[in-house]
């Protein structure tokens, strides 16, 4: 676990408060812009360097970490506000931390995306040629239930902090089937996640491919494309890089990380107690109504769910429990072997290479996640997290071009078939119904 250097943290705290005050105007629906924000790739090579960078992450809202500080030798990308550039580079240079300027104006990518989406609004039906708003996704789910009343049932897991519906669907071809839960969009800025989940759902419902049909009809599917509806809407309306929920924590800070808020080894590893941090774990386990509501829904399925699959981006990883400890789970060998077969299957169509492993060792310590909770608290022994395209070398991973939505969906569905076939062959769904 990274421990913060208090001296380094204090260097960043006062300036952070200044920029947070400016953020109050953003809450009034003024679109957040990142003009002349720069993107740096930083690679700590010593424990002292890692502590220094971690202190910046915890203390300053002037910096946006696109990935959480991890292990020595890992690269991670940091968006730097113009007024903070001198302090940021001075810290890196004084601590001899290797760094590289990747992009001089982050806003450029967001402007291109916004123009494209604005043009799309005047066009045709729901498809996977571009990304969709929360309202469009919810309307499409309503349409599925209307057009396929025998197979598709609308689900309502509750209301978000801002009173949006936690909407999902159940896809079923008959009683007595084991359940598979698909969770999308728990991190707001990861747009490829809901896009992939809706693509998979559509294929399960409409594909004539024999393997897809067999998969669709073997399980009951509980599908929630947007587990963080407030945050997702906020990325379209105000701040494209928003990650958390939208609950207010004091006058300056909003939201908790909904994938650090679940009641399984909550707040132990890889989280922050700073409410302004992107990895803030919340005031208590299930402090966020979104995680609390989704957990209550899943608890009602206890004994029926055979698998819980969460979709995130980015880095091209397939991960499984645990995140709070390096100790292996009881069925670690099975999970590892299934993951190995799954990533091989994923690579066949487009050559996309994934890595795999337990969360703690493969990427970084992270406690309080939905997948760890489903595994550890709900006894769902097939529990995986996909970190979708692109790989970790891409700085603009949250702005994945729309022409990669369908390929991402195709290869992910290929791999999901293998994942569920491999786990089924090991008997994991024999008593789930």
From Swiss-Prot:
This is Zinc carboxypeptidase A 1. It comes from Anopheles gambiae. Involved in the digestion of the blood meal. The lineage of its organism: Eukaryota, Metazoa, Ecdysozoa, Arthropoda, Hexapoda. It comes from the Eukaryota. CDD domains: M14_CP_A-B_like. Disulfide bonds join 253-276. Belongs to the peptidase M14 family. Keywords: Carboxypeptidase, Disulfide bond, Hydrolase, Metal-binding, Metalloprotease, Protease, Secreted, Signal, Zinc. PANTHER family: PROTEASE FAMILY M14 CARBOXYPEPTIDASE A,B, RH39904P-RELATED. Induction: By blood meal, 10 fold increase within 10 hours. Its EC number is 3.4.17.-.
């Amino acid at each position: 676990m990274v421990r913060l250097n208090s001296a380094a943290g204090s260097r960043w705290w006062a300036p952070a408060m200044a920029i947070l005050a400016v953020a109050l105007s953003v809450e009034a629906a003024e679109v957040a812009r990142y003009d002349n924000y720069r993107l740096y790739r930083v690679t700590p090579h010593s424990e002292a360097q890692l502590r220094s960078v971690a202190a910046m992450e915890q203390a300053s809202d002037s910096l946006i970490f696109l990935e959480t500080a991890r292990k020595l030798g890992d690269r991670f990308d940091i968006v730097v506000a113009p007024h903070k550039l001198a302090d940021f580079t001075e810290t890196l240079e004084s601590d001899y931390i290797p760094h590289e300027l990747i992009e001089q104006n982050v806003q450029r990518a967001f402007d291109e995306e916004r123009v494209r989406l604005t043009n799309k609004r005047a066009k045709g039906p729901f498809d996977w040629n571009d990304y969709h708003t929360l309202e469009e996704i919810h309307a499409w789910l309503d349409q599925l239930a209307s057009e396929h009343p025998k197979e598709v049932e609308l689900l309502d897991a509750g209301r978000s902090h801002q009173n949006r519906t936690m909407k999902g669907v159940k896809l079923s071809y008959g009683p007595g089937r084991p359940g598979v839960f698909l969770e999308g969009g728990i991190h707001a800025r990861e747009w490829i996640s809901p896009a992939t989940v809706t693509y998979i759902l559509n294929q399960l419902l409409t594909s004539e491919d024999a393997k897809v049909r067999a998969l669709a009809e073997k399980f009951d599917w509980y599908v929630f494309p947007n587990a963080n509806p407030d945050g997702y809407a906020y990325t379209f309306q105000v701040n494209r890089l928003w990650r958390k929920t939208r609950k207010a924590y004091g006058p300056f800070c909003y939201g908790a990380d909904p994938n650090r808020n679940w009641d399984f080894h909550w707040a132990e590893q890889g989280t922050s107690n700073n409410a302004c941090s992107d990895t803030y774990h919340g005031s208590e386990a299930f402090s966020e109504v979104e995680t609390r509501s989704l957990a209550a829904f899943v608890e009602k399925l206890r004994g029926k769910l055979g698998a819980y699959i969460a979709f995130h981006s980015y880095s091209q990883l397939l991960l499984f429990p645990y995140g709070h400890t390096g100790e292996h789970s009881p069925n670690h060998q099975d999970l590892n072997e299934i993951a190995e077969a799954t990533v091989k299957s994923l690579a066949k169509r487009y050559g996309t290479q994934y890595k795999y492993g337990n969360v703690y060792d493969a990427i970084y310590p992270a406690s309080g996640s939905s997948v760890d909770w489903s595994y550890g608290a709900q006894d769902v022994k097939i529990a995986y997290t996909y970190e979708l395209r692109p790989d970790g070398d891409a700085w603009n991973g949250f702005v994945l071009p729309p022409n990669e939505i369908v390929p991402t969906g195709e290869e992910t569905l290929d791999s999901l078939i293998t994942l569920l076939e491999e786990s089924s062959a090991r008997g994991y769904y024999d008593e789930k119904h």
